[in-house]
Amino acid sequence: MIKFEKVNYTYQPNSPFASRALFDIDLEVKKGSYTALIGHTGSGKSTLLQHLNGLLQPTEGKVTVGDIVVSSTSKQKEIKPVRKKVGVVFQFPESQLFEETVLKDVAFGPQNFGIPKEKAEKIAAEKLEMVGLADEFWEKSPFELSGGQMRRVAIAGILAMEPEVLVLDEPTAGLDPKARIEMMQLFESIHQSGQTVVLVTHLMDDVADYADYVYLLEKGHIISCGTPSDVFQEVDFLKAHELGVPKATHFADQLQKTGAVAFEKLPITRAELVTLLTSLSVNSGGEN
């Protein structure tokens, strides 16, 4: 689906202000996967994200998206199709809304790619239903809606382009806890429908709950990758790099360090923690 091979990126190369942001990145996003990218501010994850849909081109190495190869020598006309294959929901996407009605805003993207108005509005209606926005809102101005509803409109606008990969850049930033949970459940539902998803986040619990593969970035390098269940076992390594772990993993690790219990494998979700503690309680009771 998407493959990075020895990708390096330098801002303002061949100048006194040259600044290298990515170092020999090898990364793969498989079709149908839910891949997470984790890192602090300055880790390179935003630069990497912009390579996913061709907003940036590698200084060295190559990025393959489907059958399109992007390198330092690629022309813009060669890269443009990548932007239809990979849809990016940037932070606070509602700031990009501009049309007079919700339906028109969502239909704008498909029309911009040459789809007739009637068909574009049909696609828009399907995507608005997908994101859970009732038709009573479709003829309203997007600016009459709540923040969470506006974000759903913006996400529907990206989905209306029917991308093969949906990239989410800190998608719950600024939302209250209830809206945040609803938003993550929405993305999981979209993923379950067959959509390939890439999540850029600093929230480890979201990675544990939803992702099936994760890459950790630090200062432009991938320092760890694997399934969340494997990566989050390295609690001390992550702490040394000032990266957190899911709350359930932290609790289990602290409990294990007291000597009260030994886990074969640390849980990464609340559900796993409850199951393990219940099992230990039952076994302990059986011994008594």
Curated annotation (Swiss-Prot):
Transmembrane segments: none
Annotated ABC transporter domain residues: 2-244
Source species of the chain: Lactococcus lactis subsp. cremoris (strain MG1363)
Keyword Cell membrane listed: yes
Protein name: Energy-coupling factor transporter ATP-binding protein EcfA2
Family membership noted in the UniProt record: Belongs to the ABC transporter superfamily. Energy-coupling factor EcfA family.
Entry keyword annotation includes Nucleotide-binding: yes
Any GO BP annotation: cobalt ion transport
One example GO MF annotation: ATPase-coupled transmembrane transporter activity
Alphabetized UniProt keyword annotations: ATP-binding, Cell membrane, Membrane, Nucleotide-binding, Translocase, Transport
Gene Ontology CC annotation, any one: plasma membrane
Localization per Swiss-Prot or TrEMBL: Cell membrane
Membrane topology: Peripheral membrane protein
Gene: ecfA2
Subunit and partners: Forms a stable energy-coupling factor (ECF) transporter complex composed of 2 membrane-embedded substrate-binding proteins (S component), 2 ATP-binding proteins (A component) and 2 transmembrane proteins (T component). In L.lactis forms a stable complex with EcfA' and EcfT and substrate-binding components. In E.coli forms a stable complex with EcfA, EcfT and individually with 3 tested substrate-binding components (BioY, NiaX and ThiT) with a stoichiometry of 1.1:1:1.
Main location: membrane
